[in-house]
Amino acid sequence: LATDYDGTLAHDGVVAKKTLTALERFKKSGRKLVLVTGRELPDLKGVFPELSLFDKVVAENGAMIYTPASEEERVIAPPPEPKFVARLKRQGVKPLSVGRSIVATWEPHQATVLEVIKK
């Protein structure tokens, strides 16, 4: 079973106890659990300590695969170019989240981000 975190498992940033219980039952039945999220792994670990319920975590919009049992992290894309991130910051793009493989912000900055990409 693959499931999203925000708005699916977690509502208003909280995973309900009954949801955790259902996930535990599912896992004990021998089935596999995969958590899929756009969040960066350190952020996810900070808000959801129950990651060990999952066999795999697909984070950073698919750019990182994490195995909780072994704590193995596999990045499937190169890190963001520091010059690119610096240009976005100089252009005043906020919020700006820089992960191991992704750079994320909100839609109002779309034109600025596209301009920086073109350069």
Q: Where are the predicted features?
A:
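Metal-dependent catalytic neighborhoods of phosphoester/phosphodiester hydrolases
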Residues: 41-52
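A short helix->loop->beta-strand "cap" motif at the edges of active sites that frequently abuts
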Residues: 28-32, 53-54
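Catalytic-core regions built around general acid/base machinery
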Residues: 17-30
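A structural signal for isolated positions on well-ordered beta-strands in alpha/beta enzyme cores
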Residues: 32-34, 102
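Conserved phosphate-coupling serine/threonine residues in phosphotransfer and NTP-handling enzymes
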Residues: 37-39
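HAD-like small-molecule phosphatases
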Residues: 46, 55-119
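Asp-based phosphoryl-transfer active-site loop
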Residues: 1-13
